[in-house]
Curated annotation (Swiss-Prot):
Protein name: Alanine--tRNA ligase
Gene name, Swiss-Prot/TrEMBL: alaS
InterPro entries in alphabetical order: aa-tRNA-synth_II/BPL/LPL, Ala-tRNA-lgiase_IIc, Ala-tRNA-ligase_IIc_anticod-bd, Ala-tRNA-synth_IIc_core, Ala-tRNA-synth_IIc_N, Ala-tRNA_ligase, Ala_tRNA_ligase_euk/bac, DHHA1_dom
Gene Ontology annotations for the cellular component aspect, listed alphabetically: cytosol
A Gene Ontology molecular function term of the record: aminoacyl-tRNA deacylase activity
Source organism (scientific name): Thermus thermophilus (strain ATCC BAA-163 / DSM 7039 / HB27)
CDD domains for this protein: AlaRS_core
């Protein structure tokens, strides 16, 4: 049974049980900074497990089913080395928000597996939490699973989150029941007698049913108290690829129909069959290219931090394994269309965004292969500093791996060719230290249900989300509902206290969509607090970070909330950002997509997908288009509409962003260019007419990462100040060069030409100095040993470039081995004849350094370094020649 058929059978089955089928949510979590990527099927549905009403399509649905794409990188080093680990996977799930519970979840799971997938009931085993008698009895009495195939386990195996009772976290939790498939003795080990025993792969977990019925409270770590939840939920997860491997009767998911075509293509491209030791590299490439294509298709971009660093690491690991297969040129981008072909029917964004994704991957590959070349040079330098028989330290091998992406096995192979060993134990220790740091930093998966302050939960249950008034007003009267300081809820806050203030309604915009959070004042009789920024919770409760300056602020106080008037500048910049986006697409093409933004009062920053720097004329056209929009003074309107209607009208959505059923569409009613319009889904603050922006000037354009560019610009008074400052600097420069501003460019070109001429004269003088020194001897007489002519020359005052030139000249004059010294520097050059007699510059220099002090290295005909004692070097060199 093909993977696509299994996926459809599952979703159709639960639709028949009254579930709403939802499309997969983005891999990029929406409004959940605790997650780098969507890592579980339930992650996007977290608010509904915590009590939010599950409204979809205008009605409430208590039953939902999904096939969710997920990405996890916690065990990345095991990917490819085992048949159980992968990064990008699809999780089938059925969910109940306070509707059905254990009985239905268990009976439906059994029905689907045995009647619809036709799995042999005799090969299905189940496990339950040791204290969950209810689940045990359902399996035994209602389903009919024999007692010997029902295992009872503790909180580490059959409670979610694992170990939560003893170790936390606090919050919703519950027992779980897992379903395993017995693949037979051929897949196992003698000690494997059932699920969670032994070390083999005989018993494969295919489905986990989580019964979220308790609120865990208490010390962490320490024995927790399990309080029954008012709303009991069901959260299940079935690994699509594990089930596919069973139904397709293949040994692991790498041979299923969504993986194996990629592995076959890698084998074809490399000429290395999928077998033996190299099969690890085939699997790594197949897994990682799927993950990279999926993440980029959902809006991620390569970077040095956060999720961008994760996908960069995946791409580089795949490239390293390609290198081991002999693929030394960019090749991953050529696999992207195959990934889109295999997965694009269910994830259409992969096909829609394929051209941009291919381009990003190609650029990132080219950049990294240059880095890999740097790793080769670094490894050569490290090995050159070792004595014969020495071992490369593990920390250095790991630094090569971590900085240059240089795989350990490649380091071992190259070192062995040169006669050196590698401290692999030290490498593993350094790796484990980094993984420990990584696990500590990325403990978010365990905290997926981490609870906010109880007061916020109670406020939301009682009043709902904060009412936002800021689209139409910068001031409002409001009531203080709560004061929070850290984890504490306060009744009042005095002068100097920093608190998070919750109001019943607010004109303050909460940070989001690239726009910074509003700042300003809260005023009340006898008191004042300064709001530094504003954010909001997942549930839409606005948190005003404020410091009390005068008086005492109390819960229940009526305050006047006043947004700083600079918000108007923020509005100018936000509308200008929309115009910039449209202008970039008009000038550069429809491949341009927003990849990030910052909208502040004093500037705007816009990141967008484009493979190369903008030409000056392109920047000029973009800037002119935006200013024509401004001068036309078109109205700016916004209205709410269903998401599908907005898409049909052509409203631009953020690349990879997921939206609710009803969205706000911001539109500029007019255009300076036929066929060009600005219409975007946006919750931010905007001017009422484009003329309010005043003016728009681009300050800079630069690269952010491979395939992503950044423009910074200013509007309004900031644009005037920027223009005036630029003119003043131009005038000052012209005065300093004693020319008129109109003649400034001509004067600079003349100065640059004169500078180049002087540089040529300096180089000529250096060459003459070298010739004079050599002609004057410099100790550079030629001597002979074993048919090789050698010389040592001391030439004071030369830089490294001149030293190399001197060595070249000596070889051209007949020397086979030329050592040139200047101050603390040294260059060694060999003739083809010397190389033909078995000499290698790096090895000869290291041998010389052992006798004359100093360090250095090289390869082939050239080596360089420093610290050699000239007298000792002159005495030692002939003894090192054949």
């Amino acid at each position: 049974m093909r993977t696509a058929e299994i996926r459809e059978k599952f979703l159709s089955f639960f639709e028949g049980k009254g579930h709403l089928r939802l499309p997969s949510f983005s891999l990029i979590p929406e409004d959940d900074p605790s997650l780098l990527f969507t890592s579980a099927g339930m992650a996007p549905l977290k608010p509904y497990f915590l009590g939010a009403k599950p409204i979809f399509g205008g009605r409430e649905w208590r039953r939902v089913t999904t096939c969710q794409e997920c990405l996890r990188v916690g065990d990345i080093e095991n990917v490819g080395r085992t048949s159980r680990h992968n990064t990008y996977f699809e999780m089938l799930g059925n969910f109940s928000f306070g509707d059905y519970f254990k009985k239905e979840a268990i009976l439906w799971a059994w029905e689907f597996l045995t009647e619809h997938l036709r799995l042999d009931p005799g090969r299905l085993w189940v496990t339950v939490f040791e204290d969950d008698d209810e689940a045990y009895e359902i399996w035994r009495d209602l389903v009919g699973v024999p007692e010997e195939r029902i295992g009872r386990f503790g909180e580490d195996e059959n409670y979610w989150p694992g170990g939560a009772i003893t170790h936390g976290p606090n919050g919703p939790s519950g027992p779980c029941s897992e379903i395993f498939y017995d693949r037979g003795p051929a897949y196992g080990t003698p000690d494997e007698t059932g699920p969670n025993t032994g070390s083999g792969d005989r018993f494969v977990e295919i489905w986990n049913l989580v019964f979220t019925q308790y609120d865990r409270q208490g010390p962490i770590p320490g024995p927790g108290i399990l309080k029954p939840l008012p709303q009991k939920n069901i959260d299940t997860g079935m690994g699509l690829y594990r089930v596919a491997a069973i139904l397709q009767d293949v040994e692991d998911f790498y041979r299923t129909d969504t993986f194996f075509p990629i592995i076959q293509e890698v084998a074809r491209m490399s000429g290395r069959p999928y077998e033996g030791k190299t099969s690890v590299s085939h699997r790594v490439i197949a897994d990682h290219v799927r993950a990279v294509v999926a993440a980029l298709s959902d809006g991620a971009t390569f970077s040095n931090t956060g999720r961008g660093y994760v996908i960069r690491r995946l791409l580089r690991r795949a490239l390293r394994h390609g290198y081991l297969l002999g693929l030394s040129d960019p090749f991953l981008h050529r696999l992207a269309p195959l990934v889109a072909e295999l997965l694009g029917d269910f994830y259409p964004e992969m096909r829609e965004n394929l051209p941009a994704v291919e381009k990003q991957i190609r650029l990132e590959e080219e950049r990294f292969l240059e880095t890999l070349e740097g790793g080769l040079k670094r490894l050569d330098a490290l090995l050159s500093g070792l004595k014969p028989g020495e071992v490369l330290p593990g920390k250095e091998a790991f630094r090569l791996y971590d900085t240059y992406g240089f795989p350990l096995d490649l380091t071992v192979e190259i070192a062995a060719e040169r006669g050196y060993g590698v401290d692999t134990e030290g490498f593993q220790k350094a790796m484990e230290e980094q993984q420990s740091r990584s696990r500590a930093a990325m403990a978010f998966e365990r905290e997926i249900f981490k609870k906010g302050a109880q007061v916020l939960e109670e406020l939301y249950a009682e009043r709902g989300a904060t009412e936002f008034l800021g689209y139409n007003a910068l001031e409002a009267e409001a009531e203080v509902l709560a004061l929070l300081a850290g984890d504490q809820s306060l009744l009042e806050a005095g002068p100097g206290t920093e608190v998070q203030v919750v109001l019943d309604k607010t004109p303050f915009y909460a940070e989001g969509g690239g726009q910074i959070g509003d700042f300003g004042l809260l005023e009340w009789p006898g008191g004042r607090a300064r709001v530094e920024t504003t954010r909001k919770t997942e549930r839409g409760i606005f948190l005003h970070k404020a410091r009390v300056e005068e008086g005492v602020l109390r819960v229940g106080e009526r305050v006047r909330a006043v947004v700083d008037p600079r918000r108007r500048d923020t509005e100018r910049n936000h509308t200008a950002t929309h115009l910039l986006h449209a202008a970039l697409r008009a000038v550069l093409g429809p491949h341009v997509r927003q990849a990030g933004s910052l909208v502040a009062p004093d500037r705007l920053r816009f990141d967008f997908t484009h493979p190369e720097p903008l030409k000056p004329e392109e920047l000029e056209r973009v800037e002119l288009l935006v200013n024509r929009w401004i001068m036309a003074d078109f109205p700016v309107t916004w209205r709410y509409m269903p998401l599908e209607e907005a898409r049909k009208e052509g409203a631009m959505a953020l690349f990879g962003e997921k939206y609710g059923e009803v969205v706000r569409v911001v539109r500029v009613e007019g255009s300076p260019l036929e066929g060009l319009e600005s219409k975007e889904l946006c919750g931010g603050c905007h001017v009422r007419r484009t003329g309010e922006i005043g003016a728009f000037l681009i300050r800079s354009e630069e690269a952010v990462s491979a395939g992503v560019r950044r423009i910074e610009a200013v509007t309004g008074e900031e644009a005037i100040r920027f223009a005036r400052g630029s003119l003043n600097r131009l005038k000052a420069l012209a005065e300093r060069l004693e020319v008129g501003e109109a003649a400034l460019e001509e004067r600079l070109e003349k100065l640059l030409a004169e500078l180049k001429e002087k540089e040529r004269e300096v180089e000529s003088l250096k060459a003459r100095l070298v010739q004079a020194a050599l002609g004057g001897g410099g100790g550079a007489s030629l001597e002979e040993k074993g048919g090789l002519r050698w010389t040592v020359a001391e030439l004071p005052g030369l830089d490294a470039k001149a030293l190399r030139q001197a060595a070249d000249d000596l070889v051209a004059r007949g020397a086979d081995v030329a050592l040139v010294l200047s101050g603390g520097q040294a260059v060694l050059k060999l003739s083809p004849k010397a190389q033909g007699m078995g000499l290698e510059a790096g090895a000869l220099f290291r041998a010389l350094a052992e006798k004359a002090g100093g360090r250095g290295g090289g390869k082939g005909a050239l080596a360089q370094g420093g610290g050699l004692d000239p007298r000792k070097a002159r005495e030692a060199l002939p003894g090192l020649l054949p």
